[in-house]
Curated annotation (Swiss-Prot):
Known EC number: 4.2.1.113, 5.1.1.-
Membrane-traversing stretches: none
UniProt entry tagged with the keyword Translocase: no
Family matches, as Pfam families: MR_MLE_C, MR_MLE_N
Protein name as it appears in the record: o-succinylbenzoate synthase
Subunit annotation: Homodimer.
Membership in a protein family: Belongs to the mandelate racemase/muconate lactonizing enzyme family. MenC type 2 subfamily.
Catalytic residues (UniProt): 164, 263
GO molecular-function term, one example from the UniProt record: O-succinylbenzoate synthase activity
General function of this protein: Converts 2-succinyl-6-hydroxy-2,4-cyclohexadiene-1-carboxylate (SHCHC) to 2-succinylbenzoate (OSB). Also acts as a N-succinylamino acid racemase (NSAR) that catalyzes the racemization of N-succinyl-L-phenylglycine. L.innocua has the menaquinone synthesis pathway, indicating that the species requires OSBS activity. However, the NSAR/OSBS is not encoded in the menaquinone operon, raising the possibility that both NSAR and OSBS are biological functions.
């Protein structure tokens, strides 16, 4: 497959409500759609998930799109791609920049699935017709507001809830939710807000029957997480410091965690994600699909991944209306008894809603890729 053209669509969707974590707050989803067009006129779509600020990882939206334009697309223009797995190797000499790589690589996967006239889910070996999903709730001002939100999402059908926590917004909030919802599948996500000095507080969370505590310590740390996991009965889950299967191997070798939050964007795309999922299954590590407030294209890629058999725990994927009044794809993803349907149409299985996308588009740039074919 040769790619003739790339289209970079910069859009920004307002969130229904601000989403707050221990490191910052988002009021909108600022992103790019990466559209690749091959010699047969097939369109593949990826979504660039890097945030505006370098507070989740080092990448930002502006740095990632620069890497895509100046480094990744020129590489794509220089060769025939025979299978989507080649993209990971093609980009491998470029250090880091996983989210930039993922946005382009996922567009290639979509294009190949469409060329083969099958869904992306089927192409990567997924078998589920629908997937269980959970919901992630950002930091709230008070316990009362949090309880109202949890009740709202439980009423909508979500069976697993993740609470963002931070110093002074942890034990009291978790305890209140657990008392009000004693049978709810519940977990806490710290986004690296704690350190070893907070051990007694983290140990106190053991009593609330949590599914896991996600990323309590630093984004580069494996050793302190291993120290903590040995002293907690609750699973530790790693997120930010997992960028490749090598990171999972390191975490497993020293006992840093018993669960992995797998995000396509954070690990560089589908090829890397599949390796991680397979490793986790072989080594009895719970793996589940995380989210980054994706719009419809990114959500579709996530659902395809989560439809594989390695994923038994509900992910942070959620329905389209969890974050947005309207999404950029049709059909939108709707919750049905705590589940989302896995698209069966070709590729990612949804199409761009051009009317909605145009409404929220900030700019569009086209780049020709057919000058350097070899």
């Amino acid at each position: 497959m040769y790619f003739q053209k790339a289209r970079l669509i910069h859009a920004e969707l307002p969130l229904l409500a601000p989403f707050k974590t221990s490191y910052g707050e988002l009021k909108s989803k600022d992103f790019y759609i990466i559209e690749l067009i091959n010699e047969e006129g097939i369109h593949g779509y990826g979504e660039l998930e890097a945030f505006p600020l370098p507070d989740y990882t080092e990448e930002t939206l502006s740095s990632a799109i620069l890497i895509i334009k100046e480094q990744l697309l020129p590489l794509l223009a220089q060769r025939k791609i025979r299978k989507p797995e080649e993209i990971q190797e093609l980009f491998s000499w470029i250090q880091g920049n996983e989210m930039a790589k993922a946005a382009v690589e996922l567009a290639v996967w979509d294009a190949f699935a469409k060329m083969e006239k099958r869904s992306l889910a089927k192409m990567i070996g997924a078998t589920k017709e629908s997937i269980k999903v959970g919901v992630s709730i950002g930091l709230q001002q008070n316990v009362e507001t949090l309880l109202q939100l949890v009740n709202q999402y439980v009423d909508q059908g979500y069976e697993r809830v993740k609470l963002k926590i931070a110093p002074n917004k942890d034990i009291q909030f978790v305890e209140a939710v657990r008392k009000s919802f004693p049978k709810l599948s519940l977990m806490a996500d710290a986004n690296s807000a704690y350190n070893r000095e907070d051990f007694l507080l983290l140990k106190e969370l053991d009593q609330y029957d949590l599914e896991m505590i996600e990323q309590p310590f630093g984004t580069k740390d494996f050793v302190d997480h291993a120290w903590l996991q040995k002293q907690l009965k609750t699973r530790i889950c790693l997120d930010e410091n997992i960028r490749s299967v090598k990171d999972v191997e390191q975490a497993h070798s020293i006992g840093s965690c018993r669960a992995i939050n797998l995000k396509l964007a954070r690990v560089g795309g589908m090829s890397s994600a599949l390796k991680i999922a397979e490793y986790c299954a072989l080594n009895e590590i719970l793996v589940w699909c995380g989210g980054m407030l994706e719009a419809g294209v990114g959500r579709a890629h996530n659902i395809a991944l989560a439809a594989r058999n390695e994923f038994v725990f509900p992910g942070d994927i959620s329905a389209s209306n969890r974050f947005f009044a309207e999404d950029i794809v049709t059909p939108a993803f709707e919750l049905n008894q705590g589940r989302l349907k896995v698209p069966t149409n070709e590729g990612i299985g949804v199409t761009l809603d051009l009317k909605v996308l145009k409404k929220y588009t900030k700019s569009t740039e086209e780049i020709l890729l057919n000058k350097g074919w070899s």
